[in-house]
Amino acid sequence: MDERPWQKNYDNGVPFSIEYPPVPLFYFLEKAAEEHPDTPCTIFKGAKITYREMDAITDQLAAGLAEIGVKKGDRVGIYMPNTPQFIIAFFGILKAGGVAVATNPLYSAREIEHQVNDSGLEVMLVMSNFYKMIKEVQPKTKIRTVVVTNIKEGLPPILSFLFGLTKEKKGGFKVELSQGDIWMKDLIEKHKPGDRPKLDIGPDDVALFQYSGGTTGVSKGVIAVHRNLVANTLQIRYWMTNCNDGNEVTLMAIPLFHVYGLVAGMCFSVRAASSMVMIPNPRDIADVLESIQKYKASIYPGVPTMYNAINNHPDVKAKKYDLSTIKGCISGSAPLMLETKEKFEGLTGGKLVEGFGMSETPTATHCNPLFGKNPPGSIGLPLSDVDARIISLDDEVTVLGPGEIGELVVKGPQVMVGYHNMPTETANTLRDGWLYTGDIARMDEEGFFYIVDRKKELIKPGGYQVWPREVEEVLVTHPKVLEAGVAGVPDPYRGETVKAWLVLKSGETATEEEIKEFCADKLAKFKIPTHVEFRNELPKTTVGKILRRELVRQHKEAEAQKPA
């Protein structure tokens, strides 16, 4: 069999291998500023910052960070939603020689405390409405300086003025800084671009601590060096064969604190000198739709939940928006259903393809071709310079052939250096240059890969094996079902049994029996859910992954409260 059967299915123009320049990640920003100086880098509610301006501002911030004691290798936190300030903070940190640590704005004080202490960061750049939370956490950490920005600083003058009048205080954005803390605006304005520290920052210097989403337990700090991020940025750029540098508009709704938004959204856009339309709240579908139409967005990285929301929006059905400028979208983080893909492509005329990656490969390893085959259920082909194998679950070494199910292992220039402070986890995950993903998968004869499920989420009812994803994929084909989550729950007879949690489409009703009957000729008897629970929504990560373990926790809690 061909060693890399996937290469023959690459789109025309996608190289088998790429030459990666030995440069720091911010080289792409400097190059965009040089080649496309007047192209907007960010657009936020109408306010634009060009690539020339972004390069200069981030130089100034780097000088400011150096002034407050940030040295090469220091970890620096970012705690903000998708705004121009996030991008300024990220590249300012890298230019100062720092290591960016992006934090989820939805995290609790306990979760933030864990990240801050684990990473050892001492300086944090935050949006003002999160300042109070950081000050609560600060005494339990080594944070010494908080650099604060207000969302209105990224807005056009008139909107900034109106925001100050109507929403600033109510939204918690108006804050008084404690001694030792500083406004980001002041830190930038104190310096000229030429003040940036003169540092030797190379491809093997650490650029990012990316904390994994924690869908399978405690959040782990992935260490990525500049060459990892440079490589994946270029792999994605070369995959997007219909993209023209300096002429694209990226809708940045996918959160930047997540590695998918950070690399496939922001880094890709900077390399392509694409204008990023910043969407701080991805659930604000009206903002998403208006932004696509107003700014003629052409690239829209997202998750299935986002594309579904557009597909089912009443104003889209009523044809109130022109979405025809969309030409390329990569969907990640959750399975992309064929119905979602076909409907979205029909509405926009663009391409929507499923990709795959992890925090440990910041960010992508596989993607379906934009113009070639897209087999239903496939995560696609390994990207340029990525090797992938399916290995035996028994000995974790034997390479399996097409159609056989085992663990997906990958190797490529984007694979992380390791986990921070977790040598055992690192040794278990990285073996002889191969990353053991923990995902159960198969590869077909043509080199397309398919995820079967997470290794840790296998359900074993009475000794059988049930992969939750297989059951979920059947359930979402029911005409009344919008979303499905499946997991194993304790069962006194079988030890464990299959439970499904369903969200129905608007206005629909269904019964447990109806769902079980629907599954009867599509699944083996032991795979059919024993329990079906209908919900208004399912717990998810910020990028739309269903949290199966949270569903199980809620189930156990409810069972414990039942009378004996």
Where are these regions (language model features)?
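ANL superfamily adenylate-forming
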Residues: 7, 133-203, 314
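AMP-dependent adenylate-forming
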Residues: 4-7, 27-50
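Conserved AMP-binding/adenylation subdomain of ANL enzymes
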Residues: 230-249, 259-298, 313
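Conserved AMP-binding/adenylate-forming core of the ANL superfamily
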Residues: 21, 38-83, 87-91, 108-113
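AMP-binding/adenylate-forming catalytic core of the ANL superfamily
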Residues: 126, 300, 412, 417-418, ...
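Conserved AMP-binding/adenylate-forming
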Residues: 248, 274, 279, 328-329, ...
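Adenylate-forming
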Residues: 81, 126-136, 149-157, 254, ...
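Conserved adenylate-forming
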Residues: 65-70, 191-204, 209-252, 274, ...
